[in-house]
């Protein structure tokens, strides 16, 4: 193997060398025997103008390159650098394609040596990294990266990253390296020779495995540490600290500088009493109360004293991770006993080692499957949970995960991986746990009586409890979407596509045939063709129905259309007939597959482990097919009280639609199946009350006011001194103008405000279409070119990634919709200005909103005051909560929607947030306020 690596980075005028794009900067770092021995960089004259966006990205302009050499003038140097070396780059095919083109144009041979891609290597060697951009990886590994998108800086950082990747590769167990080598032929990177040398080195020096690693059935795994159930053995001489001075003494041990929070102590007592007295309890705790510790401390004390588990359920993964990794360790510092805690998820979140080990033998892999297998091989040396949420999977990786996820076996089989199984370990740990952390959906699966991972429990804390009603509605409902249905049928495939169908026929061919009973392969193949066609037509007809019934003519691209059983139009009739045909074909295909599987099963004793696993996979596919048919019938062919609707983007191909069915209200189900069977449920959130009353949330959840404790704990922050609320007078009333006119008016204000605040601004929208139009208009205006605009749904990345990027830049503006109204935590000066573009009422055309309002009106109620207004107020409170995250923050909140002061109900919004100074005025007065306040 060559011990010389040349790490190259290029800046270019665009992405297409064959279409005339050129190199404008060349950077190279040479590594020999693990040490950087040379650096070389040069600007290049591209002999064409550098586009404005490239200049903005790289900082390189026409003036800087006009006297630089042509690429042809540095080819001799480039060739000497690459002589006998590996070509290494971050996304190697991009840099290589430009280099080849330039070398060929200079009359030379291209580079035909070995290549290594650091993106690809990082994907499998850092399987849990947040992202694989160079900036993300540099941040992860604490590498100095001051000048991204400059070739010399990028090449240096890529070289440092490459050395770290080599070190990680060398540290892997020999058995893992052998498996990676076997798979590496399917990659872009030429890894085999290098892996061979690393393995030879390990062979020669007789490998010593780290203590934390074990080899089991030819897989290197991290040793798992089971939770030890000490409930019966524990003799804890510790009482709950009921007095304030006792709490101070206990909590003080966890903090270097402890500041007493009276609200937090009140919360502790309320939670402890709820469990002691078996009382359902609602606690609204304002920002800064210290909610997590406020419920965890009494929960831990109660659990230890009574030897019963407490289930803590949250809505977001982010909060679950925070509880497990930050709050529980803090709790263990301040309490004199060990707390057994476990994070539980649904079964399909856990890897099946049995299935994974079998798929390692499959030969017909695509690129994504190969890379995901390599990712998982490395991850198995690190993970203690086998939870897929730890992994950063590609979209193709998620498809592969479906083959290896943990599922209940359809027919009994001997599982040789039982003692190492991640799901079984999670179940065992749950039995030993004092505190079980989970999510609302898994909590509800316990209600539904689905084989839950949760042990028996009577005491629950629901954090982010305002989400429970929405999660329950989704949980008790059904959904059908084109991509999932198509993917499922695609997994089975046609015979010639060599997917599950082909593999099933292979199993069948190996056993004696039962004459006349089974369909011919050709007939089954035709059935799959018919079903695929009918499924396409079915989803096209869903789209036709949606477009025909669409009443929203405001130019929105994303539409939601209610599907009514009372409708007798031709579009509905065509759709129902299509659903009947799909259900019929699904039934036939399911029966034909099960007949075949039952035949194969008769020879079960003669099947190898691999064939038995394939049979299991086929049975699971059959169950999924039956479930799909069941959903089609429930959604289209059976009368039900569920609200049914269609969601689609009018710009997408016409069959890419989603059909949903959900109950309008879930209060009765929650009351009967949850609140009446649990001894004490504590529901907490920063947003439970409307106008200081809990009646709305209690009605939504089916709670009895007389039997429920209600406790409000205000935030310790001094909002009067920390926040100013401003309402511009010179904007049009939102319902008096068209969407486009309103967007033009607010965009002018946004530009003026941004220039005054120097960015540091979060804009909250209620609809994506308005966000998109505003973003495009700001961009077109050119007034904010020096600001970084980050927009949900436009800028790529998760909410966490977008928030992090917003905090990274001095002059940044973040535009968000639904999920940004809550759960975004941007403390300090990073966020100084919050703009609420319109009051967050759900559209009356939103199917669930329309159905709820209809039912309330039919029952003689007032839909606006009983549902639409309280729901909007809770969302408004969540939005307000984004601005002030610590006692030192200061900020300005601007509400563009003048209904907050021009309508009677507007006052209810202002009453529901802490008391702050409210000012009305023109944009000029607002700018003056910004300068004096911020």
State where each predicted segment sits.
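Signature of the SF2 helicase/ATPase Hel1-core->accessory helical subdomain module
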Residues: 321, 409-435, 439-584, 688-700
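Conserved RecA-like P-loop NTPase helicase motor core
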Residues: 728-741, 794-897
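Walker A/P-loop
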Residues: 277-298
């Amino acid at each position: 193997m060559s011990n010389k690596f040349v790490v190259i980075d290029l800046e270019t005028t665009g992405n297409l060398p064959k279409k005339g794009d050129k190199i404008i900067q060349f950077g190279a770092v040479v590594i020999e025997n693990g040490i950087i021995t040379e650096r070389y960089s040069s600007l290049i004259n591209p002999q064409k103008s550098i586009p404005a966006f490239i200049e903005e990205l790289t900082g390189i302009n026409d003036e800087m390159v006009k006297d630089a050499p042509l690429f042809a003038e540095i080819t001799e140097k480039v060739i000497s650098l690459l002589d006998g070396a590996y070509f290494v780059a971050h996304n190697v095919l991009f840099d290589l394609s430009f280099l080849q083109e330039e070398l060929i144009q200079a009359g030379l041979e291209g580079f035909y040596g070995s290549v290594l891609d650091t993106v690809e290597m990082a994907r499998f060697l850092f399987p849990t990294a947040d992202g694989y951009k160079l900036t993300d990886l540099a941040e992860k590994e604490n590498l100095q990266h001051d000048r991204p998108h400059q070739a010399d800086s990028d090449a240096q950082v890529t070289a440092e990253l490459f050395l770290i990747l080599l070190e990680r590769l060398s540290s892997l167990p020999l058995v893992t390296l052998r498996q990676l080598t076997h798979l590496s032929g399917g990659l872009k990177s030429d890894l085999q020779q290098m892996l061979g040398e690393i393995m030879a080195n390990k062979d020669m020096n007789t490998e010593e495995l780290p203590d934390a690693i074990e080899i089991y059935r030819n897989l290197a795994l991290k040793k798992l540490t089971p939770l030890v159930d000490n409930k019966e053995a524990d003799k804890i001489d510790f009482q709950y600290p009921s007095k304030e001075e006792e709490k101070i003494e206990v909590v003080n041990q966890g903090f270097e500088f402890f500041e007493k929070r009276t609200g937090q102590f009140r919360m502790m007592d309320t939670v402890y009493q709820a469990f002691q007295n078996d009382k359902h309890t609602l606690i609204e705790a304002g920002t800064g109360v210290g909610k997590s510790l406020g419920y965890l401390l009494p929960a831990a004390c109660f659990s230890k004293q009574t030897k019963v588990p407490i289930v803590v359920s949250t809505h977001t993964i982010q909060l679950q991770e925070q509880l497990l990794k930050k709050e529980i360790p803090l709790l263990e510092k301040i309490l004199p006993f060990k707390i057994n805690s476990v994070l539980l998820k649904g079964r399909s979140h856990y890897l099946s080692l049995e299935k994974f080990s079998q798929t390692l033998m499959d030969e017909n892999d695509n690129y994504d499957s190969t890379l995901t297998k390599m990712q998982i091989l490395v991850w198995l040396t690190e993970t203690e949970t086998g939870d897929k949420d730890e992994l950063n999977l590609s979209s193709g990786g998620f498809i592969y995960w479906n083959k290896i996820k943990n599922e209940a076996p359809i027919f009994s089989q001997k599982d040789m991986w039982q003692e190492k199984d991640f799901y079984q370990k999670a179940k065992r740990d749950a039995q030993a746990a004092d505190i079980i952390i989970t999510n609302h959906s898994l909590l509800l699966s316990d209600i539904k009586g689905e084989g839950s991972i949760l042990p028996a429990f009577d005491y629950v804390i629901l954090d982010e409890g305002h989400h429970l009603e929405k999660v329950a509605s989704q949980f008790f409902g059904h959904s059908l979407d084109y991509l999932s249905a198509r993917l499922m049928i695609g997994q089975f495939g046609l015979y010639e596509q060599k997917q599950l169908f082909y593999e099933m026929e292979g199993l069948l061919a190996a056993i004696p045939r039962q004459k006349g009973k089974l369909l011919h392969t050709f007939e089954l193949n035709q059935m799959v063709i018919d079903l695929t066609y009918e499924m396409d037509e079915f989803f096209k007809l869903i789209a036709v129905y949606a477009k025909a019934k669409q009443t929203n003519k405001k130019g929105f691209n994303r539409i939601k259309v209610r599907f009514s059983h009372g409708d007798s139009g031709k579009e509905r009739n065509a759709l129902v007939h299509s659903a009947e045909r799909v259900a019929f074909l699904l039934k036939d295909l399911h029966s034909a597959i099960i007949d075949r599987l039952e035949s194969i099963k008769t020879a079960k004793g003669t099947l190898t482990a691999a064939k038995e696993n394939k049979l299991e996979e086929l049975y699971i596919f059959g169950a999924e097919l039956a479930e799909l048919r069941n959903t089609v019938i429930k959604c289209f062919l059976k009368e039900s009280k569920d609200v049914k609707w269609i969601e689609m983007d009018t710009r997408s191909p016409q069959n890419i639609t989603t059909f949903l069915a959900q109950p309008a209200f879930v209060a009765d189900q929650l009351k009967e199946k949850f609140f009446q069977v649990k001894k004490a449920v504590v529901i907490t959130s920063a947003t439970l009350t409307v106008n200081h009353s809990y009646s709305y949330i209690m009605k939504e959840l089916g709670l009895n006011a007389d039997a429920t404790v209600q406790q409000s704990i205000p935030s310790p922050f001094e909002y009067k001194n920390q926040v100013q609320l401003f309402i511009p007078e010179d904007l049009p009333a939102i319902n008096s103008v068209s969407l486009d006119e309103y967007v033009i008016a607010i965009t002018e204000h946004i530009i003026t405000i941004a220039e005054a605040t120097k960015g540091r601004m979060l804009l909250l929208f209620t609809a994506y279409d308005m966000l998109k139009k505003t973003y495009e208009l700001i961009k077109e205006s050119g007034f904010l070119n020096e600001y970084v605009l980050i927009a949900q749904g436009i800028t790529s990345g998760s909410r966490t990634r977008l928030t992090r990027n917003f905090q990274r830049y001095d002059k940044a503006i973040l535009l968000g919709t639904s999920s940004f109204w809550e759960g975004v935590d941007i403390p300090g000066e990073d966020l100084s200005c919050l703009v609420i573009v319109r009051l967050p009422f759900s559209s009356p055309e939103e199917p669930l909103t329309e159905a709820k309002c209809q039912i309330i009106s039919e029952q003689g109620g007032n839909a606006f005051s009983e549902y639409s207004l309280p729901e909007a107020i809770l969302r408004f409170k969540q939005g307000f909560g984004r601005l002030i995250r610590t006692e030192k923050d200061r900020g300005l909140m601007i509400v563009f929607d003048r209904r907050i002061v021009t309508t009677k109900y507007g006052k209810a919004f202002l009453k529901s947030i802490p008391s702050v100074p409210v000012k009305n005025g023109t944009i000029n007065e607002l700018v003056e306020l910004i300068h004096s306040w911020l």
